Design a protein with these regions (language model features):
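Extracytoplasmic beta-strand/coil segments of soluble accessory domains associated
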Residues: 1-36, 57
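N-terminal periplasmic accessory domains that precede
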Residues: 12-16, 29-34, 47-49, 74-97, ...
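Short acidic/polar hinge/loop motifs at secondary-structure boundaries
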Residues: 36-63
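Transmembrane beta-barrel wall of Gram-negative outer-membrane proteins
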Residues: 104-186, 192-194, 199-208, 246-248, ...
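Membrane-embedded beta-barrel scaffold of Gram-negative outer-membrane proteins
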Residues: 113, 251-257, 261-267, 272-279, ...
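C-terminal beta-signal and adjacent terminal beta-strands/loops
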Residues: 363, 558, 676-685, 703-745
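Gram-negative outer-membrane beta-barrel transporters
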Residues: 423-427, 549-558, 579-685
Length: 745
């Protein structure tokens, strides 16, 4: 499993190399908290919130296509947090405080977690968990504005559960979870220099003349220097944003008298996030070109240099409202027959404002700008407020912006049936049938009013996903299995195509070029779903009198009709928005093959070793004929997507090892631990334009225990390795530098 942060609010989560190459569809990885689905399904999983790992009983990671155990099916796998439940037997509480100093950052970052378990009656209890994370940044902005540690994170959250146990066979739990985060920025290090692309020397980041900047401290993956700086800095622009999530779940579990457990899970999920981040000067140059083309000569306020040339505004605003209901019936007897039956319903509304209208309906007026207006902070400070108002009034008449409204509904049934033939052999079959509806409404240009829509589309798909597993246990401490499973993502609608079709429609009668674009994009409005077929052979064994355990699996995933995004240009038609269209299409196919393993060994008294890793030797596009060498969406340079390209965020290998030693120190029990990690080079996009280099880190920790107290000290990234998660024309996204911390609980 791979998890990395690509900006302050964008995260990438993948299992076995199955990473969504395009936003907008369902995530390839499902996410649960207990029985509550919290998957980022509207954005392809790129904004998945992970929450805090405190007062958690365990974390389950189910790899490969999942769809026959839980309602929220996924093509790559499922992750599930199992929380500790309220306990009526007695009062309990815990507190954990972390303080840490991050290299390249001033001050102390802190994380505070707390839990209290309150018995209310003999069979009724409440458990409340709260936390606050205050993390200092490491990125420094340089001239023309000097500001240090700008990529801050301030996050608070609460998880409260009330559980009632009316009988020994029944449980009713109400779970409320709320997270609120505020982010500083930018979270990217943009460096004003020219860096050639290793795979294509012609695909380069342009050199920009940045006034007031000497470009001291350049850094790239091949040269040394200070990486944690950004050569951006509008004199008045402030990057940052916020993310607020609220989740409410009612879960009822009942052990029925005929040998089965019935579970009902009802979930309401609401999320609102908005973020504005300075990005590369390329975006500012593009917007300045719009100013020049659309109103220069017609409006005297529109002159070259109106906008600040050192950075553009990367903006999004997103709102999600989801209701989900799941019923699951699972056998709980010792019979040779075991089974699971389930039904799932989901209704999700999503509003996106990647290019928000600058007014709340009506004529553009500066005083009524929405806070997400994409031009609001882009002007050179020397331009007067009156001229800014005049320019935006002209531009919003030409490019008014709009909102996109999405609706995702799913009705599915699923189940598994297994039979144990004898002590050695067991067979399992599973099936999932899903009916998914994906609707999209394109808001009228210049309007933020929900009822004003100029185009509505609907894409309905059905899928059947089977699963087969054969298990052999030749002896009590050895198990081998073989699995074939299928995962499916539903079809979606091209949001960028919808808006461009509305612009092209009035021009098709007289302009044959516009007609050609219109016909092509009309055929691309609806995108079929993609699917993955997984073959897996695995082993689980225990040897040396239980002192060594081993798990391993070989997997082969055939990804068909893969959904991918690329840029499509209509710049040869006069009068259209001069932006390319982010076109989503079923590009062809991909394949992922590899070996996963984990070894746990007791080396000697008090010494334990854990080693694990993944060899993902094949993770490549096998069919790209539908793309014809197109450039991946949102990236600079014409490096095409081709057969043989490696899938995004899929390193060829990754390993970890941890060594622990338990000892006594005066009146304390203690443990010393050393962890090492290696992640090979990977690509951030399917066109393999620029790689994120490999990295290795070593962490160390010493912890002392006494009664209910635990005191520890740790160092993460001991060697202060420069970790580059992403490298493209927007900048560098880094992992944490050396961090020295303490923990008391």
């Amino acid at each position: 499993m791979s998890y990395r942060t690509n900006s302050q609010t964008y995260n990438t989560l993948s299992i076995r190399g199955i990473t969504p190459p395009a936003a907008g569809g369902s995530s390839t990885v499902g996410f649960y908290m207990d029985n509550m689905p919290i998957t980022d399904s509207a954005n392809g999983g790129i904004r998945q919130s992970m929450g805090t790992i405190f007062d958690i009983e365990r974390i389950e990671v189910l790899k490969g296509p999942q769809g026959t155990l839980y309602g929220e099916g996924a093509m790559g796998g499922n992750i599930r947090y199992i929380t500790n439940k309220p306990d009526p037997s007695g009062l309990d509480y815990s507190v954990r405080v972390n303080g840490e100093s991050i290299s390249e950052s001033d001050g102390i970052s802190t994380v505070t977690n707390g839990m209290i378990n309150i018995p209310i009656a003999d069979r009724l209890a409440a458990r409340i968990v709260g936390y606050r994370r205050d993390r200092n940044g490491v990125i420094d902005q340089v001239a023309p504005r000097s500001e240090e540690d700008v990529d801050t994170v301030d996050e608070t959250g609460v998880r409260a559960m009330v559980s009632f146990y009316p009988t020994d066979e029944a449980e009713i739990s109400l779970l409320y979870n709320r997270v609120k985060a505020e982010y500083g920025g930018p979270g990217l290090g943009y460096h004003c220099f020219n860096v050639g692309t290793p795979s294509d020397p012609n695909g380069q980041v342009p050199i920009y003349d940045l006034p007031g900047t000497t470009c001291a401290g350049e850094y790239d993956v091949y040269n040394s220097g200070d990486p944690y700086v950004t050569h951006l800095g509008h004199p008045t622009f402030t990057s940052g944003g916020d993310d607020e999530q609220e989740m409410l779940n009612l879960s009822i579990s009942w052990d029925l008298p005929f040998g089965a457990t019935l579970t009902s899970s009802t979930t309401q999920f609401d999320r609102k996030s908005q973020y504005s981040e300075e990005t590369s000067p390329r975006f500012a140059a593009g917007v300045q070109g719009i100013v020049d083309a659309s109103c220069f000569g017609l409006n005297p306020a529109c002159v070259p240099g109106t906008l600040w040339s050192m950075g553009g505004d990367g903006l999004f605003a997103n709102q999600t409202d989801r209701f989900a209901q799941e019923l699951r019936l699972v056998s709980n007897t010792n019979s040779d027959w075991q089974w699971t039956l389930g039904a799932y319903y989901k209704d999700e509304d999503n509003t996106q404002n990647d290019l928000d209208a600058c007014t709340v309906g009506g004529s553009p007026v500066y005083d009524t700008f929405e806070e997400n207006c994409y031009l609001q902070y882009g002007f050179d400070p020397a331009v007067s407020i009156d001229d800014q108002r005049s320019v935006i009034q002209t531009l919003t008449a030409f490019i008014p912006g709009n909102r996109i409204y999405k609706n995702l509904t799913e009705e599915s049934v699923y189940g598994e049936l297994s039979y144990t033939f004898n002590e050695q052999w067991e067979a399992l079959v599973g099936l999932r049938y899903a009916r998914v509806g994906y609707g999209l409404e394109n808001g009228s240009a210049g309007s933020n009013v929900r009822s004003e829509v100029d185009l509505s589309l609907q894409n309905d798909t059905t899928s059947t996903s089977p699963k087969f597993t054969l298990t052999w246990r030749p002896q009590a401490d050895l198990m081998l299995y073989a699995t074939w499973s299928n995962g499916f993502r539903p079809g979606i609608i091209n949001p960028g195509v919808v808006a461009r079709l509305a612009e092209l429609a009035p021009l098709t009668a007289e302009d044959p070029i516009a007609k050609g674009h219109y016909d092509f994009l009309e055929s691309k409005k609806l995108v079929d779903g993609d699917e993955a077929n997984n073959i897996e052979i695995g082993i689980k064994a225990t040897v040396a009198d239980g002192k060594v355990s081993f798990t391993g699996s070989l997997y082969n995933i055939d990804w068909k009709d893969m959904i991918i995004a690329y840029d499509y240009s209509t710049n040869d038609v006069f009068g259209l928005t001069p932006f390319t269209v982010d076109l989503i299409e079923n590009a062809g196919g991909a394949e992922s093959q590899g070996l996963e393993f984990e070894i746990r060994a007791e080396l000697a008294d008090n010494w334990n070793l854990n080693v694990g890793g993944d060899f993902n030797w094949t993770a490549e596009i096998t069919d790209a004929t539908a793309l014809s060498g197109a450039a991946a969406s949102g990236r600079y340079g014409g490096v095409g997507i081709s057969e043989g390209n490696r899938l995004a965020n899929a390193p060829k290998n990754s390993f970890y090892a941890s060594l622990t030693y338990d000892f006594s120190a005066r009146s304390f029990d203690a443990q010393a631990r050393l962890d090492g990690y290696h992640v090979a080079e990977s690509w951030n996009t399917a066109n393999n334009e620029r790689p994120a280099p490999s990295y290795q880190t070593i962490d160390g920790r010493v912890t002392f225990y006494k009664e209910n107290w635990k005191i520890g000290a740790y160092i993460r990234n001991i060697a202060d390795e420069i970790i580059v998660y992403e490298f493209n024309q927007v900048g560098f996204r880094y992992g944490r530098p050396r961090t020295v911390g303490f923990e008391v609980s």
